[in-house]
Every structure is written in structure tokens, then in C-alpha cells.
Amino acid sequence: MDEDETTYPEALRRLLIETPAAIWQLDDESAQCNNCGGPFTWFRRRHHCRWCGKLFCYNCCNSFAKLPVSSVSVDPTEDLIPQDMFIRDPDFLANDNDDDNDSQDSSWINVRVCVNCRQQLSELKELDLPYPITTCLNDDTTTRSNNQVIQSSCGNNLQRIEEPDDFVECPVCYAPLSSFKTLSERESHVANCLSNNSSSPRNMTEFLKHARRYISMQLSETSPCLGQECIICFEEFAAGDRVARIEYCLCIFHLKCYRDWLSTGAAGCPVHAATLHLS
């Protein structure tokens, strides 16, 4: 079933407009579906999710959702989104009454999304979150530098985990990491920020903007998190598990556990944001 944008709460519509487009994953950057892991072949073709920008097979990317043009991921080799894909919906836009924000009167487009993004859109619609959101596999703090090693955490202990993307800004103080010359300097900065500021972010407004953000990934057989416990369900992580990595603190939880946690109204990570609840 396609996501019906006419039921998006006003706050979510505004957040979708404010969310920057995800980076487009090039065809040669993935030989398999980012969801089921099936290899791409002549018969199993590549399909891009227009919200997270990642590559999927047809079975994992056959839903559609209406999104603002500003948040649609596009092929960098294409100059523009085809005009015949634009949708002007007066009934949908009629609920946006903020005259001070011209971006509310924006073109919306019906695009293909993956199963994970469709699920996240459904959850966000139900929660009516007042904070910026991100896609299930990407966020506006990542770049297309592949096979980088970044610092992550399971529970309270920092671990090293290979991820396809690297932060371009510190998830704690939001300082640009491009100012650091080496990867080790970036890792050291993030580790220090997590150690010194995990309980007192730069300001609460900025914290709330980032507290719920996460990316979804599947654990491999070599993941350093294997055997450690998800502190929500107390079950050990196993190869093949779908997990959520929190942007702010880099903690990792089972994806379903974290989504269930968010549905209670929690502001974010159970470890670092357990005392914050939505009003």
C-alpha cells in the first residue's frame, strides 16, 4: 500500500520539507540489495529509494510515497527531476498556513521508496514528531566515502564498526569534521565529545533536533557488536539482525526494539535521552 500523504500531520509535512535530500548511491557502490542482501543481476535489477537514496531490489523497493521535491534524492548526473513527476495538490497544501515560510507552498512528487523508509514514514505520521527526521539508511550528516571505519557504541562501550558512510559533522557538538586531517583525529574528537558532553549537549534545542535520528543496518558475521546485549530487550545481537544506530550517541539497538521505544514518546536513546519525553 502506498503512503497517503494527505494524512501527514502538519508538523511532519513541514519536517519533510526541511529535511535535506539524501545522497544518491551510485550503481557501482552496491552489488546487492541494501535490505535483503540479494545480489543484483540482469533479472534482479537495481531500484533507488528516492528518500534514502540507497539501492534495493524490486521486492524491497516497490512502494510509493509523496514527498517534497526538496527532500527527494536524485541522481547527481541528472540536472533536474522530470517535470511530469511534479504534483501540485491544493487540498494537501491548504493545511500549511504559515505565511512566513514560503517553502510550505512547495511541489510534491510521488516517488518510489524502500520498505524501511515506508515503515519509518508510517511511524512518523503516527507520532507527529516535532523534530527533524532522517531516512532509515542515511542522514544529512553522511557522505559517500565508502568503507570508512568510524566509532560506534553498543550500550556504553565504544566499539569500531565498518560502515559505508562517515560523519561529516560531529554528532555531539556538530562541528565540521572536515577540519580534521585524518580519520583518527575525527574519531578522537567524537570520542572526546561523547565522553565529556553525552549528558550535556551544546544546547537542548540542538539535542532534540538530533536525538531521534538513526540509521538502519544489518549486522554481519564480523560485527563487533555480536554477543553483546541490546539494553532494551536484553537479547544478544546476532548476525543478520536489523539494528538502529543512533546519530547523537552512536548507540546500537535492535531496530524493532528502538522503534517500539520511540512509540512510547521517548525523546531518543534509552541510555542518553531516557529522561526526555515528548510533551
From Swiss-Prot:
GO terms for cellular component: cytosol; endosome membrane; late endosome; nucleus; vacuolar membrane. InterPro entries: FYVE-type_Zinc_Finger, Znf_FYVE, Znf_FYVE-rel, Znf_FYVE_PHD, Znf_RING, Znf_RING/FYVE/PHD. Pathway: Protein modification; protein ubiquitination. Its EC number is 2.3.2.27. Zn(2+) 1 binds at C33, C36, C57, C60. Its main location: cytoplasm. The modification Phosphoserine is found at S200. It is found in: Cytoplasm; Nucleus; Endosome membrane; Vacuole membrane. GO terms for biological process: cytoplasm protein quality control by the ubiquitin-proteasome system; protein ubiquitination. GO terms for molecular function: phosphatidylinositol-3-phosphate binding; ubiquitin protein ligase activity; zinc ion binding. Signal peptide: none annotated. A zinc finger (FYVE-type) spans 27-122. It is a peripheral membrane protein. It comes from the Eukaryota. Functions as an E3 ubiquitin-protein ligase. Binds phospholipid vesicles containing phosphatidylinositol 3-phosphate. This is Putative E3 ubiquitin-protein ligase C36B7.05c. It comes from Schizosaccharomyces pombe (strain 972 / ATCC 24843).
